[in-house]
Amino acid sequence: MKLCATSSEPARAAWPLSEPALAYFPDARSASDRDLAAGAYSPGVAMEHIPVLLDRCVELLTPALTRRNPDGRGAVLVDATLGAGGHAHRFLSDLPGLHLIGLDRDPQALQIAGERLAPFGDRVSLVRTRYDGIDDALAQTGVAEVSGFLFDLGVSSMQLDRTERGFSYSADAPLDMRMDSDAPLTAADVVNTFAEKDITRILREFGEERFAARIAKHIVRRRPLNTTGELVELLYDAIPAPARRTGGHPAKRTFQALRIAVNSELDSLRAAIPAALGALETGGRIVVMAYQSLEDRIVKTEFAAATASRTPPGLPVELPGHEPEFVALTRGAERATPEEIERNPRSAPVRLRALEKVAGRPTTARRDAR
């Protein structure tokens, strides 16, 4: 296996109200707010990582990975959000000739996935990077074109399991929320040093929080805030009681917003999707699973542009050579089936979209590719 590189005690937060299950698109890849509300997740207790929509991902990507050989020889799959390596393990097991490149910014995730995927030897290359570092990762691994990309967005169960990371509002922990533990900015930095107007903007834009201004005012008045428990208590005071009784846990939007801001998640995604599309070979496929509306809008917009004709508007016929470079493999966004949700409740919020590259400009070979 190749390794590359780029650049408090658990405690239940005290809420006098019950924590209802979310009815809208909660933001979690592997442990949703619905799981938390149902008691399916206990801080400090490791959970089995059940890959979301695993069979559907295999169904969509395998044709691209077996175009040359039925065992995947000559094909490269990039798992841009490696996490615990659940999806990666399935593809490597099914296709004994496949080479997989796994990306993750979290060194703990790379360690866990590396141990899990070690039996596959040099068929696996792991790169520590955000998923917008695709071009550099491919250059480091000597790959010019990719047969398939898989993106499984959001926060992982491992990150939620580790209380000290500060991602969960169900346990008291330091206000951290960094996916890369070496990154300089933490959630505590945001709430304790940013101007009130900037905190308001973050909560409104990244959390779609309608009480953003009220919350920001309370934060500035009460800071410094150092733990998730302190922030949860503040949110209970800041959000009006009627609003706390509907729409899920009152902290979910603020925690989502801070996490997105700390990790630059949306900017990274906006750069990553075009980079992935540009690296696909003809016949290659990309699958993206999003778990909250902000991510899904970005994916939807990028995919719509990729599947649009390049013929100038107003012409009555399609110009030769101007056909769309990509075709959609899904009709809009696919959802998990009731059976899938029954087996894996974490799949309830997922929106899956997929494309295949069918024509157009060839992928530009990278100078560093061997």
Swiss-Prot record:
S-adenosyl-L-methionine binds at residues 85-87, 104, 131, 152, 159. InterPro entries: RsmH, SAM-dep_MeTrfase_MraW_recog, SAM-dependent_MTases_sf. Keywords: Cytoplasm, Methyltransferase, rRNA processing, S-adenosyl-L-methionine, Transferase. GO terms for cellular component: cytoplasm. It catalyses: cytidine(1402) in 16S rRNA + S-adenosyl-L-methionine = N(4)-methylcytidine(1402) in 16S rRNA + S-adenosyl-L-homocysteine + H(+). Specifically methylates the N4 position of cytidine in position 1402 (C1402) of 16S rRNA. This is Ribosomal RNA small subunit methyltransferase H. It comes from Mycobacterium sp. (strain JLS).
